[in-house]
Structure formats: structure tokens, C-alpha cells
């Protein structure tokens, strides 16, 4: 992953702004007051994903969303990074995702 020539490129300031606003909006309580609390939610991340603060941020998001959803699940893949659907455990990730969709 680190040696991939398509990774590690410089991103625009706009991308960072969009990401920051998305993270900020994810933690705004008023956005969750008028939604269906019974919809299934699955949070997927790699344990080595710096975007998810090496799983700590992902766990914080999960704990926050548990206040609003009755059917919330989290799956953190050990030793995977950000793109779990194309990482070393992609078969396991797709299998778990398929199972979640089929039982949701």
C-alpha cells in the first residue's frame, strides 16, 4: 500500500475542508433526531487506518451512534488500513458486508 504509486499524493485544501465538515457533521446530535432509529448501521475500518485514528476514532463514532440507532454494528479488521475492500483481507470484508446486507 505505502509503495503504491497511486497512493500518497497531495490532496487539495477543499478535500480537507470537506472531510473536516463531514466529521463535524457526523457528531451533531440534532441531525439524528428525525431519522429512523431502526435502520441497520455497519461501521467498517482497518485497525491501522490513520483516518480513523487507528480505530480509536471509529470506536468513538460507534459509541456516539449507539445513542441513536438500535441496530448498529462495528467491524475492525486487524492490520488493515483505510481501504479494507481492497486490502489483504478483502474477501473476509466482502463476506462480512454481504452477510450484513442479507440480514439487515
Residue ranges and their predicted role:
Residues 32-37, 67-68:
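Short, conserved loop/helix-junction motifs that constitute active-site signature segments
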Residues 50-60:
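Conserved alpha/beta-hydrolase "acid-adjacent" motif
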Residues 26, 68-104:
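Catalytic active-site module of serine/aspartate enzymes centered on a nucleophile-bearing elbow/loop
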Residues 7, 11-33:
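Active-site nucleophile elbow and catalytic-triad environment of alpha/beta-hydrolase enzymes
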Residues 37, 43-45, 49:
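Short beta-strand/loop motif that positions the catalytic acidic residue
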Residues 1:
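Divalent metal-coordination and catalytic microenvironments
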Residues 44, 58-59, 74-77:
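Structured catalytic core of nucleotide-sugar glycosyltransferases
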Residues 18-21, 59-60, 92, 96-99:
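Alpha-helical elements of Rossmann-like donor-binding domains used by nucleotide-donor carbohydrate transfer enzymes
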Amino acid at each position: 500500500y505505502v509503495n503504491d504509486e497511486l497512493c500518497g499524493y497531495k490532496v487539495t485544501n477543499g478535500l480537507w475542508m470537506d472531510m473536516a465538515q463531514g466529521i463535524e457533521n457526523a457528531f451533531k446530535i440534532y441531525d439524528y433526531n428525525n431519522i429512523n432509529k431502526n435502520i441497520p448501521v455497519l461501521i467498517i475500518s482497518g485497525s491501522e487506518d490513520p483516518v480513523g485514528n487507528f480505530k480509536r476514532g471509529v470506536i468513538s463514532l460507534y459509541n456516539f451512534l449507539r445513542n441513536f440507532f438500535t441496530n448498529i454494528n462495528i467491524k475492525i479488521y486487524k492490520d488493515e488500513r483505510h481501504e479494507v475492500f481492497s486490502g489483504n483481507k478483502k474477501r473476509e470484508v466482502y463476506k462480512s458486508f454481504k452477510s450484513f446486507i442479507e440480514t439487515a
